[in-house]
Amino acid sequence: MRSKGFTLIELMVTLAIVGILAIIAIPSFTEQIAKSRRAEAMRILGDMQLRQERWRSNHTEYGTCDELVAPSTCTAYNATIPHYSISITGITPTGHTLTATRKGAQSDDRCGDFVLTVSNGVASKSTSTGAANCNWP
């Protein structure tokens, strides 16, 4: 009579295969999640840059974060973004700096914070760490 079921060796081989696949897949999956969060930060920076240009077309200088997200506040706006906080500094009639600062689960991301600086109509993009392959389009 033949028993039905798995032997201990078959079960151990299956667990070993699953373990090896997990070791390979989890880092790749984690990096893809980080990439999607970085893309969201860049989308938000692009949106804020469009708001800045819209604001500047009607005023003598670029706007503050609170002015751009009115009637809300910048603090309330940032509360809706789970992985980055947006700030605007260096506001002049000819330029400004937008920064997406990491927070929460993204706080240890290798790419650091994303910075978009506009000066005299020329935009420059950078990261706080200078890391390569950080998805800036």
Q: Which ranges hold each PLM region?
A:
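N-terminal single-pass transmembrane signal-anchor helix
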Residues: 1-29
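Short, contiguous strand/loop micro-motifs
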Residues: 4, 31-32, 38-39, 126
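Alpha-helical interaction segments
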Residues: 18-20, 44-45, 52, 73-76
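Non-catalytic, surface-exposed connector residues within folded enzymatic/regulatory domains
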Residues: 23, 35, 108-110
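Membrane-proximal N-terminal amphipathic helix
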Residues: 33-61
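Periplasmic/extracellular, small/polar-rich flexible segments of pilin-like filament-forming proteins
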Residues: 56-137
